[in-house]
Amino acid sequence: MASSSQKLISVCVAVLVVLALTAMIFRNSEISLSRKLKTEVIQSSNSSTMAAIRKLKTEEFQSLNSSTMAATRLDGEPQQQQHAVADDPDMVADEVAKLVQMSEQNRTARRKLGFFSCGTGNPIDDCWRCDRNWHKNRKRLADCGIGFGRNAIGGRDGRFYIVTDPTDEDVVNPKPGTLRHAVIQEEPLWIVFKRDMVIELKQELIMNSFKTIDARGSNVHIANGACITIQFITNVIIHGLHIHDCKPTGNAMVRSSPSHFGWRTMADGDAVSIFGSSHIWIDHNSLSHCADGLVDAVMGSTAITVSNNHFTHHNEVMLLGHSDSYTKDKLMQVTIAYNHFGEGLVQRMPRCRHGYFHVVNNDYTHWEMYAIGGSAEPTINSQGNRYAAPMDRFAKEVTKRVETDASEWKKWNWRSEGDLLLNGAFFRPSGAGASASYGRASSLAAKPSSMVDTITSTAGALGCRKGRPC
């Protein structure tokens, strides 16, 4: 009996030891996993998102030659721009939606682990602004693009160029250290500024391909003269500028590359003029008071994102499409996201022709005539915007079909989905309502309109300072 009892006790002890060891191993594994998760979140809360973006950009942009300008003849433009149009826009929209979802999941993980999150729900800003060392990794911005212009890499693959001189004395032989000297170079460049400056351009600033103008950390104004021309080139990022009081200039010789200068006829006085170009991203700029448009994209331009900008005090804000008869603009795809259309605006936010336009999560607080207009059968997909109508009871309608009979425009695909309409604002839809009809005008997942105030709260040029989250 004693021997049996001793055996039973031994078996019980062995079982208890095994259970204890198992529990200890499980607990250690759980702690290790938790620590690993926290470490990964601290190191890069958006690592999965960034990797996916880089993979997407690399795959889609392999065919572009990073050292060659776009064609400089209209005859060659259709072939060039066709490559900028998504082969399967529905797939693109799904991919971008997945990236946004991953960003949301990363923020949720941070909150569960008790870490501070500076996320706003704006996927562009949440991609880079939380990093207090943003100035040490400026080129990360190029991996944060969304929408149809998301593949614009600007000067990501080139060296930095520091603008030290705000003058523009010689537009044919620009001085090294000036903005004009930087933007005409053939090589990719990431252009930054040594200090705050006001640049008064004598003639339009004609950019070359693969350039980023990055004014973060400095208060940079392009004002009281000519402004920016993006003509027959590709891959440009313009970020952080104050552009205002642009004037018509021209009838002068102007250099456009180290090896070429030529006669320029009169320019209209746009803040940013995009002409026959692709893969363009205009982000976090403050634009106002110009002679013609604030952002105009014409003559076969496509693959454009206009995001996080603050537009004020202007009549004809944004023109997308050259003319009703210029059918090459049928390939145009433009994303207009997270912008604030603010005080003193009248019309064209935007005014569209022919192509496909995704207007998403913008804040429209002021217009005098209308917000969104068009002609020549554009497809307009308005999602998650906030439209606050003016007090004028004759200007409550968000939309305007320009010089077109109702019998014709009723066939155009214009829809409002999830928009917040305030103070009597109303959006007049037309054409198809099914999502399938808007595949080529869909470029990212819209947030609820209730988030627009937060998403657009810092639209315009940012007051970034080194060593602090921007």
Swiss-Prot record:
Its cofactor is Ca(2+). It comes from the Eukaryota. It is an enzyme of class 4 (lyase). Gene3D superfamilies: Single-stranded right-handed beta-helix, Pectin lyase-like (2.160.20.10). Residues 1-22 form the signal peptide. Glycans are attached at N46, N65, N106. The active site is at R348. Expressed in flowers, but not in leaves. Binds 1 Ca(2+) ion. Required for its activity. It holds the Pfam family Pectate_lyase_4. It catalyses: Eliminative cleavage of (1->4)-alpha-D-galacturonan to give oligosaccharides with 4-deoxy-alpha-D-galact-4-enuronosyl groups at their non-reducing ends. This is Probable pectate lyase 15. It comes from Arabidopsis thaliana.
